[in-house]
Every structure is written in C-alpha cells, then in structure tokens.
C-alpha cells in the first residue's frame, strides 16, 4: 500500500482491508489488479477478510491478465476473474472510487 517499505505496505493493506471489512456500509465492489490480485489468492494473509466481505455482498473482481502474469489463475480463492473492459466499466460507473497503490 503506497510506495516505500514492502513490509510496511503489507501491514498497511492488511490493516486497511480488515478495517473495511468491519465497517458499514461495505463497498459495493473491490477491484484487484497488478500485484493486488495476490490478495485474492491462496496463501494471502487477508483472504479471510476479503471472503467475509464477499459473503456479505461485496463483489470481488480480479484482473485475469494479472492473474495469468503471476501464474495465479488456478489459485484464486474469492471473487471472479474479469477483464479491463469490466474493470473500466465498474470504475467509471461508481459514484466514487478509493484507489490504493
């Protein structure tokens, strides 16, 4: 999350996703792309928080090109595989977006 120390970034994203999972209202959709798709896959430290949000109606979308790039398509554990057209439409139609990089 953000630019800087990788360990700190992992701590911050874990804390952020836990916080989001415990608040109301939950977001309608969360989109994961680039290295963020690793968070939706087997072995992710935040997988339970993301699954909890999905179980409570949050749509989870992971970029298929990104999953292919990292060799993770078969390890996806939550949500659906999507493409940039759907990702663009989702972001474009949203009333507001929160972007983490």
Segments and roles (model prediction):
Residues 30, 59-60, 97-98:
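Short, well-ordered beta-strand core segments
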Residues 83-93:
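Low-complexity intrinsically disordered segments
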Residues 92-100:
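C-terminal binding/interaction regions
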Residues 17, 47-51, 88:
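Short amphipathic alpha-helical segments and helix-helix/interface helices
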Residues 46-72:
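A glycine-rich helix N-cap at a beta->alpha junction
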Residues 61, 78, 91:
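Ligand-binding beta-strand-loop-alpha-helix segment within the catalytic cores
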Residues 1-43:
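Conserved mixed alpha/beta catalytic, RNA-binding, or beta-rich assembly cores of soluble enzyme
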């Amino acid at each position: 999350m953000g630019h800087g120390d990788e360990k700190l970034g992992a701590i911050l994203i874990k804390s952020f996703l836990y916080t989001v999972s415990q608040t109301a209202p939950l977001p309608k959709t969360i989109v994961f792309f680039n290295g963020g798709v690793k968070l939706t896959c087997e072995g992710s430290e935040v997988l339970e928080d993301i699954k909890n949000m999905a179980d409570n109606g949050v749509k989870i979308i992971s970029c298929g090109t990104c999953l292919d790039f990292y060799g993770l398509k078969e390890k996806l554990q939550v949500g659906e595989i999507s493409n940039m057209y759907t990702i663009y439409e989702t972001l474009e139609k949203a009333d507001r977006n929160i972007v983490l990089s």
